[in-house]
Amino acid sequence: MTNSIRIGTRKSPLALIHTNLVIQQIKQFFPDINCEIVPIITSGDLIQNKPLYDIGGKALFLKEIEQALLDKKIDLAVHSLKDVPGRIPEPLVIAAVLEREDPRDVFVCLKYKSIEELPQNAVIGSSAVRRKAFIQKIRPDLKVTVFRGNVDSRIKKLMTGEVDATILAYTGLKRLEVFNPEYCHLIEYSQMLPCIGQGVIAVEIRKDDNAMLEICNQINHLPTFELIKPERAFLEYLDANCRTPIAAYSQYLDANPRHLSKLAYREVFEGNTEALATAAYKSNRTDVSTGLTYKLPLEVEFGKVSNIQTNFMLGNLDGSKITFHTETTNIKTSTEAGIKAAKMMLEAICK
């Protein structure tokens, strides 16, 4: 096991918060590992005066970080999963995610509590074509203007009257401790589906880095990891970019997704059974620090808490046509459900 890890991340305050949350998880399992944060300025951070769809999409927030990973200048990278394209360059992989935060969007406005309450021809600041499509579906009269920058800068623009309202992710507002219920109002899923992967912190590594893979196996939040599969499959199949209005949100239909799986042991083992069960549940592999022995691989059986419902949205390039679809599937076939939805909805949009 390595003694230190170089963690690549963007330099924004929110990205650094995300990175420290990952470090907290790593330290729980590997308290002696030294974690060095390597801040990286990305092209997406430098270009703030143009919408993302005009300059290469969200991948611009990853390009320099992924290159540092490929060049072995860093050992792992931390991203907001919503910024990660459906197709990841070889030999990189999303190997772990943290538990998902509430992925809803927030209507931010000083005078009004909802999009419906805004006066005729009001201006909403947003550069996301997904949000623009939903806004225009609810209120075609509203004007949507390009609105780039980090969370703090967008709120400052709102406060100075540059726009009448904006829409931001709840996760960022909460983690930056700037969610104010006086002018921040949660938007329900029925009105606006979130961005794919919204609310999820992702860890990217090189596939052949066994040391990082072992760490990721420990910190990975399995219920969230399974939950995002249909969303990501939908995104990957469509190879969607920032010009395409697209959204998806998955949730467990069962009451308690934390108790997602049970482990079936295939050989007699030695050691403290409680410690073994804990180690196996968290990583699905041996944990040499416990001194326990069991045959790998463990067979993972998904029980009743395994049904996922995913709501999908896809629009055409100008947002004039939007289609919705819902898939309910067993956890073992959730990826296929995302692909199925993509095929059906693409056909509907193209008609």
Curated annotation (Swiss-Prot):
The porphobilinogen subunits are added to the dipyrromethane group. It comes from Rickettsia africae (strain ESF-5). It holds the Pfam family Porphobil_deam. The modification S-(dipyrrolylmethanemethyl)cysteine is found at residue 242. NCBIfam families: hemC (TIGR00212), RPE1 (TIGR01045). This is Porphobilinogen deaminase. The keyword Transferase applies. Tetrapolymerization of the monopyrrole PBG into the hydroxymethylbilane pre-uroporphyrinogen in several discrete steps. The keyword Manganese does not apply. It comes from the Bacteria. SUPFAM superfamilies: Periplasmic binding protein-like II, Porphobilinogen deaminase (hydroxymethylbilane synthase), C-terminal domain. One of its GO terms (molecular function) is hydroxymethylbilane synthase activity. Its cofactor is dipyrromethane. InterPro entries: HemC, Porphobilin_deaminase_cofac_BS, Porphobilin_deaminase_N, Porphobilinogen_deaminase_C, Porphobilinogen_deaminase_C_sf, RPE1. Keywords: Porphyrin biosynthesis, Transferase. It is an enzyme of class 2 (transferase). Binds 1 dipyrromethane group covalently. Pathway: Porphyrin-containing compound metabolism; protoporphyrin-IX biosynthesis; coproporphyrinogen-III from 5-aminolevulinate: step 2/4. Gene3D superfamilies: Periplasmic binding protein-like II (3.40.190.10), Porphobilinogen deaminase, C-terminal domain (3.30.160.40). Belongs to the HMBS family. One of its GO terms (biological process) is protoporphyrinogen IX biosynthetic process. Its EC number is 2.5.1.61. One of its GO terms (cellular component) is cytoplasm.
